[in-house]
Amino acid sequence: MIFLVLWSAASALRIYPHSIAYFNELAALIPTPASPEIPAQEKSSALVRLLNAGPRHGLRHLSDSNIDWGQEDLNLLRWYRRQSGIDKLGVCSNGSIPPGQLGFPLKSVPFDTPAPGWYAIGCDFLCREDGGFRYFRQFTPVTVIGQTMYVYHLTQEEIDARKSSGTIRGLSEKP
């Protein structure tokens, strides 16, 4: 019993101060339906999934305002200001304050087809099956801020490689 209490406390403290995105590690053990763009369970043991779980797996079960309220916009701004070489950042967030008013030098985020540049995409927009930003799932984020804001740097070479391999299509392209 003491072990379970300590585990629960450590689990909650590990994600602090990003508590809205908290998921218990057991979320990694709950099966999810496979999708061509979101891999289902990793082919690893339950113990390995359990030890590497938490908010990373929560997106498979809940999204939208369950996790992403734009709470990481200020942390994204802090991260952006520490970077060099990023002229403009495309931001797609659920925050109530428009990113331009927070001080981001903005660029538009291409809705349907990837374009080179730096982008920060809130997890809600990544999870939507009907959204035009799902193509970002085919790329590896540079960093994840607060478990809800995924930062990508797309290069033309990466985009061309994904398109030529057939792993990425814009919404206007037919499968």
Where are these regions (language model features)?
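Interhelical loop segments of eukaryotic multi-pass membrane proteins
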Residues: 23-30
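C-terminal luminal/periplasmic domains and tails of membrane-associated envelope-modifying transferases
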Residues: 30-175
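Signature aromatic-anchored transmembrane alpha helix within multi-pass, membrane-resident enzymes
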Residues: 1-23, 166
